[in-house]
Amino acid sequence: MSRRKLSKKRIFKKDPFYNNELIQIIINRIMKKGNKALARKIIYRSLKDIELVTKQDPIKIVEQAVSNVTPFVEIRSRRLGGSTTQIPVFINNERGVTLAIRWLFQASKNKAGNKYSIIKRLSSEIVNASNGMGEAIKKRDEMHRMAEANKTIVKYNVL
């Protein structure tokens, strides 16, 4: 049994403009070098762009996109015998949301058409993810496929 103290759960404040905790988490994720004003500007403009494109509430679109991209299993490497094997592990909701947000940003950064700003690429990736398409959805499906392929190894305890 470990004697190390458990880390405290981070409590995020709600975003001042949209009054939403998920938007605040996304802003903190996109922020670089402590420049939160720029991160807010990018997120707010992409939310306005989403609203113009879909004619719907952008918060609902973002929540739908994050829930579509959120995985429920993760692959962890574990050394068994002399070889390293990939073991699927169920993950909690916080970890799933963190992975979903990370994958959305990676997909928008890697998106072709670098001539468009990050705002356009991010908003299009969020709209695609809310419709069940896009690179982030492919990443989630790939993770689930790997977990399905390695489900015979679940008998070993990872944690």
Curated annotation (Swiss-Prot):
<dbReference type="Pfam" id="PF00177">
    <property type="entry name" value="Ribosomal_S7"/>
</dbReference>
<comment type="similarity">
    <text>Belongs to the universal ribosomal protein uS7 family.</text>
</comment>
<keyword id="KW-0934">Plastid</keyword>
<comment type="function">
    <text>One of the primary rRNA binding proteins, it binds directly to 16S rRNA where it nucleates assembly of the head domain of the 30S subunit.</text>
</comment>
<keyword id="KW-0689">Ribosomal protein</keyword>
<dbReference type="InterPro" id="IPR000235">
    <property type="entry name" value="Ribosomal_uS7"/>
</dbReference>
<keyword id="KW-0687">Ribonucleoprotein</keyword>
<dbReference type="GO" id="GO:0006412">
    <property type="term" value="P:translation"/>
</dbReference>
<dbReference type="GO" id="GO:0015935">
    <property type="term" value="C:small ribosomal subunit"/>
</dbReference>
<dbReference type="GO" id="GO:0009507">
    <property type="term" value="C:chloroplast"/>
</dbReference>
<keyword id="KW-0694">RNA-binding</keyword>
<dbReference type="InterPro" id="IPR023798">
    <property type="entry name" value="Ribosomal_uS7_dom"/>
</dbReference>
<keyword id="KW-0699">rRNA-binding</keyword>
<comment type="subunit">
    <text>Part of the 30S ribosomal subunit.</text>
</comment>
<dbReference type="GO" id="GO:0003735">
    <property type="term" value="F:structural constituent of ribosome"/>
</dbReference>
<protein>
    <recommendedName>
        <fullName>Small ribosomal subunit protein uS7c</fullName>
    </recommendedName>
</protein>
<keyword id="KW-0150">Chloroplast</keyword>
<dbReference type="GO" id="GO:0019843">
    <property type="term" value="F:rRNA binding"/>
</dbReference>
<dbReference type="InterPro" id="IPR036823">
    <property type="entry name" value="Ribosomal_uS7_dom_sf"/>
</dbReference>
<dbReference type="InterPro" id="IPR005717">
    <property type="entry name" value="Ribosomal_uS7_bac/org-type"/>
</dbReference>
